[in-house]
Amino acid sequence: MRPTQFVLNAAKKKSGFSVPVELTPLFLAMGVALASGTWFSYKKFFHDDSLRVSRKNPEQSALDKVLNQKAE
């Protein structure tokens, strides 16, 4: 009995990009790490009142106090 074309095509390896099964946990762990890093950074930058990213509120700066203490 000769194999048909359908059976021969099923036995061929699929071409294209395939990810090994062993890398699935790595991709999952990296996705969780990236998502948690993004979430914690967002939380720190947008909800922390003591964090000073720019000079919009100079009253929160302690630089003048430190410079005045050094000058005295």
From Swiss-Prot:
Membrane topology summary: Single-pass membrane protein
Entry's transmembrane regions: 20-42
A Pfam match: B12D
Cellular compartments annotated: Membrane
Keyword Transmembrane helix appears in the UniProt entry: yes
Keyword Membrane: yes
Keyword field: Membrane, Transmembrane, Transmembrane helix
Highest rank taxon of the organism: Eukaryota
InterPro entries noted in UniProt: B12D
Gene Ontology CC: one annotated term: membrane
Family statement drawn from the similarity comment of this UniProt entry: Belongs to the UPF0495 family.
Protein name according to UniProt: UPF0495 protein KLLA0D04334g
Organism: Kluyveromyces lactis (strain ATCC 8585 / CBS 2359 / DSM 70799 / NBRC 1267 / NRRL Y-1140 / WM37) (Yeast)
Upper classification of the organism: Eukaryota, Fungi, Dikarya, Ascomycota, Saccharomycotina
